[in-house]
Amino acid sequence: MAAIDIGDVNVVSRSYGLSAGYLHILKTNPANLSGKITQVQLYAKTGYSMANVRVGTCYIVSGTNYSSRDYEDIGTVAAGAVRTFTVDLDVEAGDVLCCTFTSGQLCYVEPGGAGIRYIFGGSIPFTNEETSNASTTGDLSFGGTGATIEVSGTNAIFFGMNF
């Protein structure tokens, strides 16, 4: 299995915080491979714990329209430090991370990344939703890692005559 990374690879405290009530899409560091994201890290701004956090993977449909691929609820992200969560998210090469939360702030920096898009009042899952530009160079303190999935011949189905 090969390693997958997506989003911010250096999740740290940042000077600014993005507010709740939006679906945030992080364009920085799209997934390098297809497989499963098994861990995500987030940094809630000091003093602003995040509640009802949902994280996911998403992809560009066309232009500025995105659709979600997979998501998981992770609950509360306590403020003031990197928090790590175990997840099971499907990901395809080129996908990016997205998240929603009902209160608190997610750390971000400007400039420092490939940009942040948003949907006001958006939720996950979503299909072919038009997004707005929050920042062309921003980066969120939000990243993930995982691995490719290898199919073993033991559980595979083969068609044809030559085995």
Question: Predicted segment positions?
Answer:
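Exposed aromatic-hydrophobic patches
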Residues: 81-89
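Short proline/glycine- and polar residue-rich coil/turn motifs
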Residues: 74-81
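Beta-sheet-rich sandwich/jelly-roll-like modules and their strand-loop junctions
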Residues: 1-68, 88-93, 100-160
